[in-house]
Amino acid sequence: MASPPAHRSSKAADEELPKASSTFHPSLWGSFFLTYQPPTAPQRANMEERAEVLRERVRKVLKGSTTDQLPETVNLILTLQRLGLGYYYENEIDKLLHQIYSNSDYNEKDLNLVSQRFYLLRKNGYDVPSDVFLSFKTEEGGFACAAADTRSLLSLYNAAHLRKHGEEVLDEAISSTRLRLQDLLGRLLPESPFAKEVSSSLRTPLFRRVGILEARNYIPIYEKEATRNEAVLELAKLNFNLQQLDFCEELKHCSAWWNEMIAKSKLTFVRDRIVEEYFWMNGACYDPPYSLSRIILTKITGLITIIDDMFDTHGTTEDCMKFAEAFGRWDESAIHLLPEYMKDFYILMLETFQSFEDALGPEKSYRVLYLKQAMERLVELYSKEIKWRDDDYVPTMSEHLQVSAETIATIALTCSAYAGMGDMSITKETFEWALSFPQFNYKNFWFICTALQRCRIDQA
């Protein structure tokens, strides 16, 4: 939650319009996505047909790859994943990864190959020991890498960021290579593809990047590589454009839902950030099968934004407590508990959750029940923070961490993502695990988010 609201109690005369006000700037997007017009059906069909031809052509290349040509095979898999194409070849890639992991017969003196192999395997869940880099250490504490071998230096830097606690060799690799890359960047042509790669890695290491953005940024870099595969390049461009069409359709739907929500509920004080929220959620699940997850995530984030603004900047304490009481009932009959300005929103919220059940169908609609439980927990903790404020209570560090780790809505967003996934491996046990608030998962996530936010504030 943000700063404390201005009022702690409600009066009958002010029931319909609380005194607190907001200062949020309006949306930068206006009706841009509402007026989006997709290509015609024949145009879309032609794009899909060409993409399928290219997918099979690339599949043949992938199936022809072996560990006998390890550098080429590792580079191909890395390229496909960076270009956002890995989803289409999961089975082929998994088979090759197992072979790469099992095959210890490769040039262990090739720093670029060792780094790329390490990065690829660790990124895909294989427990590769970091001592493969020990042989490259120098007596001075750096890493043996020829001045001209800049590619190996960059590969080592990205690989080292997949470190685990206590892996000193990777800690040292990051410190050493960062300094050398920073020095190197000043001597490269700013517009060269490699300079852009170095700059991007120094800003955000490869494995931390949002996949769909990485695909967009890497396409023009890959296009200039002498060893590029033309089928891979064409497919990457076409696939990205097809995904953009889907994203625009989803944003059009979410924008229409949001505009209707705000117009009917008359909650003009809330932040209008539906486009930014979709962009945020898209980063979590951008692959083609997860359209419903993206939509549910975006709508839930929109609802959380409204509730957060009610509790933080607009509603009185009494109003918020009434809302919290009505929230857990999930029934229209509870609107008599609410102040007038909350009633329409409450009904529209119920309709939104019903639309989730309708979209999921009879076999998966049970997932919405768990999503409701996650939202109930979130509102309960928002109320707890308000009580702390009104009572001038200073929580202990332990109490603060426990509550704030949940009020960033990780549980609600996790359940939202799971709810929209068609994969039948998502079961009731999956949701029960998420709702159990696994400490290693959410608390670490909260700590990382908070630390990164503090770093950005310090840098500003």
Swiss-Prot record:
Designated name of the protein: Inactive 7-epi-sesquithujene synthase
Regions crossing the membrane: none
Entry note about domains: The Asp-Asp-Xaa-Xaa-Asp/Glu (DDXXD/E) motif is important for the catalytic activity, presumably through binding to Mg(2+).
Species this protein is from: Zea mays (Maize)
Gene3D superfamilies reported for this sequence: Farnesyl Diphosphate Synthase, Terpene synthase, N-terminal domain
Keyword Transcription regulation: no
Record-listed Mg(2+) 2 binding positions: D308, D312
Motif range (DDXXD motif): 308-312
Role summary: Non-functional sesquiterpene synthase due to a frameshift removing part of the catalytic site.
Keywords associated with the record: Cytoplasm, Magnesium, Manganese, Metal-binding
Coiled coil: none
